[in-house]
Amino acid sequence: MLAIISSAKTLNFEKLAPKTELTIPMFLTLTNKLLSTLQSYSENQLSKIMNISAKLAHINKERFKDFDNQESKAAIFAYAGDVFNNIHIEKLTNHALNFLQSHLLIISGLYGGLKPLDTIKPYRLEMATKLNEINLTNFWQDEITNYINKILAKQKNKYLLNLASQEYSSVINPNKLKYQLVNVHFKENRNGKLSTIGINAKKARGAMVKVIANNLIDSPELLKNFSYLGYAFSTKHSSDNELVFIKS
């Protein structure tokens, strides 16, 4: 089984990460192609295409301009935000972290796909951002889908567990994916209707990654006992391709 999650806008390069054996992102040639485009933009252009403040545009312009000399950090320790904070990465054993290295893929607008211990540099680039004529979803789709097929071919249980947002999971081409895709949904009953509440769903996704790591889970079936923030598996609303957890 391979799980996918979205990268985060929030980064933490200040906090020291534990000493681990780091790996190199697999799509650096394509990353450098995107960097060339990003480096050509002015601060004002970055502000517009990324819909960010002038201050953030300045920060990212400086990052892109001197990208090779920026500090590096393992992806799973560099990203912050609700998903990553609820993995509680600092509490994972080396054994759990090594398991994630071969069972988790972080989808990124700049790097495409990242193993947890792949080194990244500080950046901002959401998957929905349009760079000139480049649609990032289309840009990465074949590369990431082919890579996932190669990884799952080596796995005992050949499932792709989707814990990413729609924006990021759209890089998976269902017509070229050779193995079963299992989507995970975290729902809440609001006014008689089941809805996804973004912040709670993100926390639950992170907690599920933590459970996968700590228990060395390699099958969606083993996640049906997952409970966090009051979520519980709903047989009624689930299917072979959809795992639905409803908050009580």
UniProtKB/Swiss-Prot annotation:
Gene Ontology biological process terms, A to Z: response to hydroperoxide
Source taxon at top rank: Bacteria
Cysteine-cysteine disulfides: none
Gene Ontology CC terms: cytosol
UniProt signal peptide: none
Family matches, as InterPro entries: YaaA
Protein family: Belongs to the UPF0246 family.
Cited HAMAP family: UPF0246
Name listed for the protein in its UniProt record: UPF0246 protein RAF_ORF0648
